[in-house]
């Protein structure tokens, strides 16, 4: 047995499923998950000593690559002054200034510890501000594991084949209305059925939890218009897309103005950080200035703020997003060309530093139904054969892949060459 197999066997006796987040268990592809010893740049190194070109990037945060010296040094320096104070710090103010400067639609921002906390808190705030209970989300989109959001969710929920999680009371779920991503007709129908009851729409501007599904040109502007028409707030969940699709996020890339924005992943540089923010009048409803309660013992802790501040300063440097886009486009085009050479039907969606691989006869993949029609079994075989080639992709047909600026042209070419060998075997 390999060391990963031994560790996984031991872990399953102590940790449910052997992992602390379900998708890591390789449930969506089968087999034994890799246990990682270290990471550097664009590479992961497992406990058995094998190196992999990494396109998971810790599920999105590692836009600069692993073990970036600026982030590492910032964490070490901050740790020397103490790990957590439970009191305000100057770095929290500097971080808030930086985030609100980079994302102009955020007049104010509140730091939390995860993307789930960010979306959960933003929805509570929207409900409190509007005095309404119902929310709209989209089929196949994932916004964390809060009860009200585990309704027809994406990400790990799709991998497990569960449209709703046990443990979510029907009384909670009834306030969550699920519409079809990229379908404004379904959204208008929901508003017309509940014109005075919907507090907000929450949406991934690029759906990254049913793989990678970009919005159609009219979709996000249409959501903005419907929210304005019916007096609801628009929450854009940029946990995945923020600082990756563009410096100011997908909202800037697609030209839509939300009322609230949720951030995560890149904002922490690899540390557990989330944030939500937006219009000043809405944020003023948050405690302690307003009646909507939200709190967190470790929110804004100095280590996480130092990591995030260092990361965002690096991400804001000129040329970062152009490089991400060029590398991702090269990978997507190369994979499609390699598949076409042997007659394998393949679609690779990509936006900025995100991409999604779909084995499908369809010409486009634009919604949940398109994603579910793809050949998941072929993806499973592709994943394992690529792993043997030293390429680490997301271990699920329903998860996006992530590029970093640490990936080189050689890494991209080696990945395409590996895919060409794998396609020849399929």
From Swiss-Prot:
Top EC class of this enzyme: isomerase
InterPro entries to which the protein is assigned, alphabetical: 4pyrrol_synth_GluAld_NH2Trfase, Aminotrans_3, Aminotrans_3_PPA_site, PyrdxlP-dep_Trfase, PyrdxlP-dep_Trfase_major, PyrdxlP-dep_Trfase_small
N6-(pyridoxal phosphate)lysine found at: 265
Any Gene Ontology biological process: protoporphyrinogen IX biosynthetic process
Assigned EC number: 5.4.3.8
Keywords associated with the record: Cytoplasm, Isomerase, Porphyrin biosynthesis, Pyridoxal phosphate
Intracellular or extracellular location(s): Cytoplasm
GO molecular-function term, one example from the UniProt record: pyridoxal phosphate binding
Cofactor requirements of the protein: pyridoxal 5'-phosphate
Pathway field: Porphyrin-containing compound metabolism; protoporphyrin-IX biosynthesis; 5-aminolevulinate from L-glutamyl-tRNA(Glu): step 2/2
Catalytic activity: (S)-4-amino-5-oxopentanoate = 5-aminolevulinate
Record's keyword annotation contains Isomerase: yes
GO cellular component assignments: cytoplasm
Alphabetized HAMAP family for the sequence: HemL_aminotrans_3
NCBIfam families assigned: hemL, PRK00062.1
Assembly notes: Homodimer.
Record family assignment: Belongs to the class-III pyridoxal-phosphate-dependent aminotransferase family. HemL subfamily.
Name recorded for this polypeptide: Glutamate-1-semialdehyde 2,1-aminomutase
Lineage, highest ranks first: Bacteria, Pseudomonadati, Pseudomonadota, Gammaproteobacteria, Enterobacterales
């Amino acid at each position: 047995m390999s060391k990963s197999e031994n560790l996984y066997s031991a872990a399953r006796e102590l940790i449910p499923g052997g992992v602390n987040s379900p998708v890591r268990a390789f449930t969506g592809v089968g087999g034994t998950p890799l246990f990682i010893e270290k990471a550097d740049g664009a590479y992961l190194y497992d406990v058995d000593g094998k190196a992999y070109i990494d396109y998971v990037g810790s599920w999105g945060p590692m836009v600069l690559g692993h073990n970036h010296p600026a982030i590492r040094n910032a964490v070490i320096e901050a740790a020397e002054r103490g790990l957590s104070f439970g009191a305000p710090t100057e770095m929290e103010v500097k971080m808030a200034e930086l985030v609100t400067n980079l994302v102009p639609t955020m007049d104010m921002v509140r730091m939390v510890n995860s993307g789930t906390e960010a979306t959960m808190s933003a929805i509570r705030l929207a409900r409190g501000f509007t005095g309404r209970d119902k929310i709209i989300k989209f089929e196949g989109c994932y916004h964390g594991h809060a009860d009200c959001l585990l309704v027809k969710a994406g990400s790990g929920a799709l991998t497990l084949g569960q449209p709703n999680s046990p443990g979510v009371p029907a009384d909670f779920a009834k306030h969550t209305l699920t519409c079809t991503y990229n379908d404004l007709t379904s959204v208008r129908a929901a508003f017309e059925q509940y014109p005075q009851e919907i507090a907000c729409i929450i949406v991934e501007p690029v759906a990254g939890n049913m793989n990678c599904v970009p919005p159609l040109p009219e979709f996000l502007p249409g959501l903005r218009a419907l929210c304005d028409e019916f007096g609801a707030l628009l929450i854009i969940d940029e946990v995945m897309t923020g600082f990756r699709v563009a410096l100011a996020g997908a909202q800037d890339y697609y030209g839509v103005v939300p009322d609230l924005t949720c951030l995560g992943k890149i904002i922490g540089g690899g540390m557990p950080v989330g944030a939500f923010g937006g219009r000043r009048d809405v944020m003023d409803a948050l405690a302690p200035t307003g009646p909507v309660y939200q709190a967190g013992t470790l929110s804004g802790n100095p280590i996480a703020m130092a990591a995030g501040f260092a990361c965002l300063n690096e991400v804001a440097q000129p040329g970062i997003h152009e490089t991400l886009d060029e590398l991702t486009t090269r990978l997507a085009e190369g994979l499609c060309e390699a598949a076409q050479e042997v007659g394998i039907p393949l679609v690779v969606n990509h936006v900025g530093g995100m991409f999604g691989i779909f084995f499908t006869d369809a010409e486009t993949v634009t919604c949940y139904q398109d994603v579910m029609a793809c050949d998941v079994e072929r993806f499973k075989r592709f994943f394992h054969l690529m792993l043997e080639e030293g390429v680490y992709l997301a271990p699920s047909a329903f998860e996006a892949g992530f590029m970093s600026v640490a990936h080189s042209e050689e890494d991209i070419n080696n990945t395409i060459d590996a895919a060409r060998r794998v396609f020849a075997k399929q």
